[in-house]
From Swiss-Prot:
It comes from the Bacteria. Pfam families: PmbA_TldD_1st, PmbA_TldD_2nd, PmbA_TldD_3rd. This is Metalloprotease PmbA homolog. Belongs to the peptidase U62 family. Its EC number is 3.4.-.-. Probable metalloprotease. One of its GO terms (biological process) is proteolysis. GO terms for molecular function: metallopeptidase activity.
């Protein structure tokens, strides 16, 4: 109850600061104004080998103001919420707008797109910031991993965090809305050793509600299992073969679609999908729906960073690219309307074939299961893809041995079109919710 009262008090204070900032701005200059404040309160704990290495308490607030002065834009921010601090921040934003080139496409979103009543998306599940409990939570996953098998010989650390975020947004068109959210995360990374090799692996979970987080003992056991399974890893010969991205790496694999269809890259003509709107870029059976309004969703939000209402929409329908991801500015540059994507995507739901992961392995028969990706070798201009990978070699639908020190490469457009199936083991710890993904063939570089 004490925490709830504190949060309510903080929220009311932030609302008053935003109102005051808007009032002071409108006194100073006759132009369009946008004000946003974000406050994050929380704790995070890192432990390693039962020793507490780091405990952090966060209580950070930042106020942003954007001024549109006859199509010239000025942006400033401050952590000083005093009246003098706000006035100084406004003066800086106004001064910047006077020295910025006029851009006809700059300005607030049209009022019809704004969110004047933010819906409750069930994102707020606060719990007390108890450092002792946080340390115990992080310690238990490490302790369980050590107990699981004698081959677990060291720890790279365990982590737990508990954070509350309050966001208040207003503009000179009359919008004033706010919402609160919580996020809990735990992570554990362990090292396994046998006679000849050492390997590390990790597990993690994240949720809006503490009770929905992976239990620390289960997390530790998963980490130990993952690390042990990688012992005896070896490099394979260079080959072209079928590949399965695990559910975790599938979320990463589909994330490359985001910059490829973002408005900034479209109007700058710096994406390999520039001419593919309303064209098929995935198999006909594949759909990606964006739903910003999933209760307790990790990517859920009632409005974007410009105050535009978020909406449910098809990103990919029957394999066809249905939309760009647009904010107000790049939408106007393209002669289109905003899609509510200022600040990024919300929740993407990637369709699957409703088969189990085991059935997916049987479907592949022989090939590579990828469980971790390394490096940043993705070129959005060309679509060329090259990343380090580790995983397991599969024969007759069963895991034969672990694999490391390989590179997978191809072109994203061809890779997306080569998707044969997706299993129903959906990754719920990402805002891109996807199962494991089977591709017909990909280049693997090894020996």
């Amino acid at each position: 109850m004490q925490l709830l009262n504190q949060i309510e008090k903080e929220e009311n204070l932030l609302i008053e600061k935003v109102k005051n900032t808007l009032f002071l701005a409108q006194e100073k200059v006759n132009c369009s104004i946008e004000v946003c404040v974000k406050k994050t309160i929380g704790i995070s704990v890192n432990i390693r080998n039962s020793i507490v290495e780091n405990v952090e308490f966060n209580n950070d607030s930042i106020l942003f103001v954007t001024v549109y002065n006859k199509f010239s834009k000025g942006v400033s921010s401050s952590k000083d919420f005093s009246t003098n601090g706000i006035k100084k921040m406004l003066e800086i934003a106004i001064d910047i707008s006077k020295h910025t080139s006029s851009d006809f496409f700059s300005g607030l979103p049209d009022a019809k797109f704004l969110c004047f009543k933010a819906q409750d998306l069930d994102l707020f599940y606060p719990s007390e910031f108890n450092i002792k409990n946080a340390i115990n939570f992080a310690s238990e996953s490490e302790r369980e991993a050590f107990k699981f098998d004698k081959r677990i010989i060291n720890s790279e650390g365990s982590f737990f965090s508990n954070h509350i975020t309050i966001k208040v947004f207003a503009n000179s068109l009359g919008m004033l809305e706010q919402y609160k959210s919580t996020r809990y995360s735990n992570y554990n990374c362990m090292i396994a050793k046998d006679n000849s090799t050492m390997q590390r692996d990790f597990s993690y979970s994240t949720s809006r509600k503490l009770d929905d987080l992976e239990k620390p003992d289960v997390l530790g056991q998963k980490t130990a299992t993952n690390a042990i399974s990688r012992l005896g890893s070896k490099k394979i010969n260079t080959i072209k073969c079928p590949v399965i991205f695990s559910k975790e790496t599938s979320s990463i694999f589909f994330s490359h679609l985001i910059p490829a269809i973002s408005g900034d890259n479209i109007y700058r003509k710096s994406t390999f999908l520039l001419y593919d709107l309303k064209k098929r870029i995935f198999p006909e059976w594949l759909n990606i729906e964006e739903n910003p309004h999933i209760k307790k969703g990790l990517g859920s939000k009632p409005f974007d960073s410009e105050g535009v209402s978020t909406t449910i929409r098809s990103i990919i329908k029957n394999g066809i690219l249905e939309t760009w991801l647009l904010n107000t500015y790049n939408a106007r540059k393209l002669g289109l309307t905003t899609t509510g994507h200022s600040g990024g995507i919300s929740n993407w739901l990637v369709s699957n074939k409703n088969i189990s992961f085991k059935e997916l392995l049987k479907m592949m028969k022989t090939g590579l299961l990828i469980t971790e990706l390394m490096g940043q070798g993705v070129d959005i201009v060309s679509g060329n893809y090259s990343r380090g990978a580790v995983g397991f070699w599969i024969e007759n639908g069963k895991i034969k041995y672990p694999v490391n020190e390989i590179t997978i490469s191809g072109n994203l457009k061809k890779m997306w079109n080569s998707i044969l199936s997706i299993s129903n083991d959906v990754n719920m710890y990402s805002n891109i919710q996807c199962g494991s993904t089977l591709l017909s063939e990909i280049q693997i570089s090894g020996n």
